[in-house]
Amino acid sequence: MSYVFRALPKILRNRPNAHIVVVGGDGASYGGPPPDGTTWKQRFIDEVRADISDTDWQRVHFTGLISYDKFISLLQVSRAHIYLTYPFVLSWSLLETMSAGGAILASDTAPVREVIFDDETGLLTDFFDTDALADNLNRLLDDAGLRSRLGAAARQLVLDRFDLEKTCLPQQLQWVDALAQTPAHP
């Protein structure tokens, strides 16, 4: 999240009508809290707030934790979804965004490259390059055809690979059947 925050001043300057919506709680979900007793969110805000005007800051919205239904509704009305993770597991939220046909700008990191193929199912950007993040977001927001094409391809990939009834459940049952037929070792 820190690199998204660091890109905010440029994003807000480049997109004077854009609203940025940040979904999630303030606590540390993966890893520990900051050593000074604050939250990561507050540390990131403190890092960039001086570079963002009060008027622009009013276009940054923090929802906190929201229900699944509200999350899906938000995905359906958003123009772009930024997903940055530095090698960690592939998140359900990315797959949900793909399923909703969202246009995705994601970090070019190992777990993400399993489903986001640059310029096919989304745009990939260097995790550490905040200028590239802002520039790639501009590219995505400037091109409705690109957003539509990437979103449709992302949705199709999720349907092909992760559909519960056609793909996941049959594979799981096959795995359980194979385990059941394996002889037990004394």
Locations of regions flagged by a protein language model:
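Nucleotide-activated donor-binding/catalytic signature segment of Leloir-type glycosyltransferases, i.e.
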Residues: 28, 33-65, 69
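Short alpha-helical donor nucleotide-sugar binding micro-motif in glycosyltransferases
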Residues: 65, 73-78
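C-terminal alpha-helical cap of glycosyltransferases
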Residues: 164-186
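Aromatic "clamp/platform" in nucleotide-sugar-dependent glycosyltransferases that forms part
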Residues: 86
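Short hydrophobic beta-strand element within catalytic cores of glycosyltransferases
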Residues: 103-106
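Conserved acidic donor-binding segment of nucleotide-sugar-dependent glycosyltransferases
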Residues: 118-119, 123-130, 139-145
